[in-house]
Amino acid sequence: MKISKLLPALLASSVAIVAHAQAPIKIGFMAELSGPQGALGQDQYDAFMMVVEQNGGKLGGVPVEVIREDSQLKPEVATQIVDKLIERDKVPIITGITFSNVMMAVHKKIVDKEVFLIGSNAGPAPIAGAQCSPYSFITSWQNDNQAEVVGVYANDKGYKKVIGMAPNYQAGKDFIAGFKRFRVS
């Protein structure tokens, strides 16, 4: 499904909430907005808000209120923010998570509360597998997919030795696992 259609579809399915409250649906937008990685999170936020503004503060015809939070690329900060968004702000949707280590820290907490999680960048492989939930949607990619293709390519070319390097966090580990999964040697 196209990204531009996913959020409006979710919001349209939440029409009963709006009908009773006649208030905007609150959306928690949590991303890494500060530090060296903050540019990516800020770009995500700017694009998201551009769509909201172009649609007169609505998504799928439903008024929305966006609550912006900075996880600082710290899983422990992100879990505190998620608690606040769910318990105090009562958001039915959280989006914007940029990095896989943050996604892994908050995923279970969000989906166990039956809050929709729309991941716009982070795509940890376990969330598409063992931890898959009908409450989570990743609109970008699954981390190990690209590396699986490279593993197949290395096999097809007959490469005997390959050196792999990746960052030591969830996404990097997913890349290495994906490569190994389709690398026969």
Name each region found by the language model.
Residues 2-20:
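Gram-negative bacterial Sec-dependent N-terminal signal peptides
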Residues 24, 39-44, 54, 58-129, ...:
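Beta-alpha junction/loop-to-helix N-cap segments that form part of ligand/metal-binding clefts
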Residues 24-40, 97, 161-165:
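Short beta-strand segments enriched in small/hydrophobic residues
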Residues 38-49, 172-180:
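Short, surface-exposed alpha-helical segments at coil->helix boundaries
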Residues 47-50, 77-81, 146-150:
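Well-ordered alpha-helical segments embedded in enzymatic catalytic cores
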Residues 91-185:
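Extracytoplasmic ligand/sensor domains, especially the bilobed periplasmic-binding protein
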